[in-house]
């Protein structure tokens, strides 16, 4: 894990696993959902929007704590006519990692919060993040959901502007990324799972309470790219180390929204989904 999902690796770097009598091995891969679900790894931090639907489809993952808010926003060309999500009606919006994936789900929720139907009022299409600006300039798309880290320099240079964000007031009290574990691992090793969660949350608290020092560590270790100014600003905005109450409230709310919006289709009982997806161990 790296960037905003670096809590588990930061916990190892700071010696928190060792303090708890645990040893840890970092694994670099392309899919934390697959790795967690098949028990190749025990813990990872990642987007709730990426993992919630697979959980309802039988993937053996459960959330054990919250990591942070924020992460991604809707961006348009700075000199475009688009100022709000309402201006995007009838337009194409890129969800870079694909239809049905986390960008798609986040965009659906952002639009829905403004009374816009993601399936009828706009067209969500996949354009890779690095091609989105060119696609906007060519008129192929009007907007894109991008990570705030990716968009930072282009906003500063006056190329892009943000018109809707997970840092806006109505989403700033909602989790973006969560700590997740293999479900069977948690059931069979509750004591170890608790120790792991404590170590990761201790790392999140360190990152929140010591943003300058933590950002330097993240950059020195290669877990944060870009410049220090950008990283300190973004890391401060994420509010690392969310309470179980905060995370549980987000899950209850988002599960109901996912069902209503048709993002979750294999189950329709919110309480049953919550039981699968939420296993606070602290």
Model-derived regions, located:
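Long, low-complexity, intrinsically disordered polar/charged segments
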Residues: 1-7, 37, 130-142, 229-232, ...
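Solvent-exposed, polar/charged alpha-helical surfaces in well-ordered, non-transmembrane soluble domains
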Residues: 6, 14-15, 34, 38, ...
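Secondary-structure end/capping motifs
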Residues: 187-265
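Conserved C-terminal helix/tail region of periplasmic/extracytoplasmic solute-binding proteins
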Residues: 255-282
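Ligand-binding clefts/hinges and TM-proximal coupling segments of bilobed small-molecule sensing domains
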Residues: 22, 99-117, 121, 195-229, ...
């Amino acid at each position: 894990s790296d960037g905003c999902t670096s809590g588990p690796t930061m916990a190892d770097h700071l010696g928190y696993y060792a303090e708890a009598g645990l040893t840890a091995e970092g694994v670099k891969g392309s899919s934390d959902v697959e790795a967690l679900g098949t028990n190749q790894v025990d813990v990872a931090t990642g987007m709730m929007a990426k993992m919630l639907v697979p959980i309802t489809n039988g993937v053996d993952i459960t959330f054990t704590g919250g990591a942070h808010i924020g992460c991604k926003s809707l961006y348009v060309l700075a000199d475009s006519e688009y100022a709000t999500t309402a201006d995007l009606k009838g337009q194409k919006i890129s969800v870079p990692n694909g239809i049905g994936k986390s960008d798609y789900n986040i965009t659906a929720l952002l639009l829905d919060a403004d009374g816009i139907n993601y399936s009828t009022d706009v067209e969500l299409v996949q354009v890779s993040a690095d091609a989105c600006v060119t696609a906007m300039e060519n008129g192929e798309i009007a907007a894109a959901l991008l990570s705030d880290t990716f968009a930072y320099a282009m906003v500063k240079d006056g190329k892009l502007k943000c018109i809707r964000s997970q840092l806006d007031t109505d989403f700033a009290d909602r989790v973006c990324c969560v700590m997740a574990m293999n479900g069977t691992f948690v059931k069979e090793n509750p004591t170890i799972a608790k120790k792991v969660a404590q170590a990761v949350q201790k790392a999140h608290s360190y990152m929140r309470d010591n943003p300058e020092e933590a950002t330097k560590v993240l950059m020195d270790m290669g877990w944060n790219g870009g410049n220090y100014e950008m990283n300190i600003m973004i890391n401060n905005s994420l509010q690392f180390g969310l309470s179980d109450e905060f995370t549980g409230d987000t899950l209850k709310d988002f599960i109901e929204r996912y069902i209503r919006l048709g993002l979750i289709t294999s189950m329709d009982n919110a309480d049953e989904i919550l039981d699968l997806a939420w296993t606070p161990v602290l």
